[in-house]
Amino acid sequence: MSKKIMATQKVIIASLNPAKITAVESAFTSAFPNGTFEFVGVNVPSEVADQPMSDSETHLGALNRVRNAKACRADGAFYVGLEAGIDGNVTFAWTVIESHTHRGESRSASLMLPPNVIAKLANANELGDVMDEVFGTENIKQKGGAISLLTQNQLTRSSVYHQALILALIPFTNPEHFPANLS
């Protein structure tokens, strides 16, 4: 696939989260300025905990989302899985992008979490729930995320996902340097 993608290509996003969908749309249109895309969000399981608590579990969640999106929708040109997780006192996300022939992956920047947030995570479902409780917000995970709260809106969940997605798209934007890695 070259940078001059002409036909409309369907991008299946393994999430209905608006922050994730916005990031995927932004990354694809930035990476392929001449491309035409249709973006479709699907609700598929990650098959990991609601709040993954390690790098490997988070990565597996993103891979599983792509696999499950492919099983759900066979009509995609690209499949995108994003999974946010925590390892120790930092949060981050893994992004996985697959076509029928290639896979690209990248981990986002890491963000330190306050000690009181880490302590409360032991008794909560997800980081977003704890952030809402500690910061008095509502549904922050579908808005700017923990990162927007802790950076005074200098960064958002979507902006950090955008960077990781651009990096995961490298095999697709430079196909002459990346042979097919999926069979």
From Swiss-Prot:
Record's catalysed reaction(s):
XTP + H2O = XDP + phosphate + H(+); ITP + H2O = IDP + phosphate + H(+)
Residues annotated to bind substrate: D75, G76
Read off the Pfam families from this record. Answer: NTPase_I-T
Metal-binding in keyword set = yes
**Residues engaged in binding Mg(2+):** D75
Obligatory cofactor(s): Mg(2+); Mn(2+)
What is the protein name stated in its UniProt record? Inosine/xanthosine triphosphatase
Question: From which organism does this entry originate?
Answer: Vibrio vulnificus (strain CMCP6)
Its taxonomic placement starts with: Bacteria, Pseudomonadati, Pseudomonadota, Gammaproteobacteria, Vibrionales
